[in-house]
Design a protein with these regions (language model features):
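Charged, amphipathic alpha-helical linker segments immediately N-terminal to NTP-binding catalytic cores
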Residues: 1-31
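Pre-Walker A adenine-sensing motif
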Residues: 28-44
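Walker A (P-loop) phosphate-binding loop of P-loop NTPases
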Residues: 58
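Conserved lysine of the Walker
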Residues: 61
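Hydrophobic positions on the alpha1 helix immediately C-terminal to the Walker A/P-loop
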Residues: 64, 68
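Conserved nucleotide-sensing/catalytic segment adjacent to the nucleotide-binding pocket
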Residues: 80, 87-194
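ATP-dependent NMP and nucleoside kinases share a basic, alpha-helical "lid"
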Residues: 141-148, 197-246
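Small-molecule kinase domains that catalyze NTP-dependent phosphoryl transfer to phosphate-bearing small molecules
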Residues: 197-200, 219-223, 248-282
């Protein structure tokens, strides 16, 4: 890859509808990329480069990926984007159901194994499940047994979220490997949101210099082949606000979803030190 073409990047080409804060973060990303290539001889010798954009929902990954791709292409570096939305094994609705089932199964089983389950507990749990509040810590003060349910359920979620059980890392790594090896035509999975929407679409990698993997888990230990990991910082509150705006999920502001977001945020924070570029919020 001719890294010297990075000097031809023209930030004035950024579209007017890109928010000011996003423009600031994009400028930092470009500056850091130039510095990395200047200092890192190994990167200079790579024929093809993979950039991983990680961060929570609402951290700006999509805008960053699209803007970087636009600027790099205009500078003469052909860039393509691969989204991680198509990496999970299950369709979005089914994956949400799987997460909830693992939480509730583990929580209830813990109560049984600790001899805390009885008719009164069953009735309370069923009501909280119906109300979708069975991940709320507010109930623990008057129901000390409930902490066993929450602890076991949360542990089950921590083991599932971002794991090879939930995400098809093998598929992701195969695509990254194909790009690095110079494969010209690659079939990319399009998961869609419903069971009957799954398909594969042929992508042209023939002249691409850079692949941007835009995905929450692009900095995961299970992902192999990323040359430049970039971490976009965000908070749980920003992620929740983004989901509320999208309005794609049910029970968006429920205690269960807040638990999921908290776990994902902790995972991201634990991985961010591996990122070569970390970009904060302004």
């Amino acid at each position: 890859m001719n890294f010297q073409l990075l000097e031809k990047i023209n930030l004035s080409l950024l579209k007017d509808d890109v928010p000011v804060e996003c423009k600031q973060r994009i400028e930092i990303a470009i500056m850091e990329l130039k510095e990395l290539f200047t200092m890192n001889q190994k990167l200079q010798k790579e024929e093809k480069i993979i950039i991983g954009l990680s961060g929570g929902s609402g951290s700006g990954k999509s805008v960053m990926a699209e803007s970087l791709s636009y600027l790099l292409n205009n500078a003469g570096l052909k860039t393509i984007i691969m989204t991680g939305d198509n990496v999970p094994f299950r369709f979005p609705r089914l994956n949400d159901e799987e997460r909830l089932a693992r939480f509730r199964n583990a929580g209830t089983a813990s109560l049984v194994s600790h001899d805390l389950y009885n008719e009164e507990v069953r009735e309370k749990l069923q009501k909280w499940m119906t109300d979708f509040t069975d991940a709320s810590y507010d109930y623990v003060k008057e129901n000390p047994w409930f902490s066993y349910y929450l602890d076991a359920g949360k542990k089950a979620l921590e083991e599932y979220l971002g794991s090879p059980i939930e995400q098809d890392f093998y598929y992701c790594n195969e695509i990254l490997s194909a790009f690095k090896k110079g494969k010209k035509q690659v079939w990319l999975k399009n998961l869609g949101r419903e069971e009957d929407s799954l398909c594969y679409e042929e992508a042209d990698f023939s002249e691409a210099d850079i692949l941007i993997l835009e995905w929450t888990h692009s900095n995961s230990d299970y992902v192999k082949g990323v040359d430049i990991p970039i971490f976009l910082e965000s908070t749980v509150e920003e992620t929740l606000e983004y989901r509320l705006q999208r309005n794609r999920d049910t029970h968006i502001d429920s205690p269960f979803l807040m638990m999921v977001l908290g776990i994902e945020q902790n995972q991201l924070e634990s991985q961010k030190n591996k990122a070569l570029i970390k970009i904060r919020r302004f």
